[in-house]
């Protein structure tokens, strides 16, 4: 029997508290000595979460990686290109693939990936991103450049995703671990109809 692969929708990039990348907006760097004198636009400094490349490589050994971000493609694509140096992300979904609900905009509806959600997982630092499928979501601690020793990807998420890849249905395991339907209800969002 061959190894089963569990599709995994990993949200990373774009936003103030990203899953895999940290951003800092600021003034442009000082001009080079031979500057043409034209004003420069602001720039964004990107900090990769520690272990990001190893995490993506190891996950790709047992899961199909899909990047699903609420970021606009023109902005997010260059960041994702940088993040995915080994080309392990199979598909990229940007803001036009998100939906608006009565509670939030830019929600990632996993039903666009498959009608059968028993083996689909979304990892996101913003739980509201997966409010339509709370039983498929793994809330991730946000990353910022001020956390150079962050081990969330390799120590916390990788073992959990490996464990989930062995399950016929990830939702009961994720419910036991995170109780996301109750979390959404505490935040005023009903989750009826999203059960296993």
Regions found by a protein language model. Give the residues of each.
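C-terminal cap/substrate-recognition subdomain and adjoining C-terminal extension
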Residues: 61, 72-196
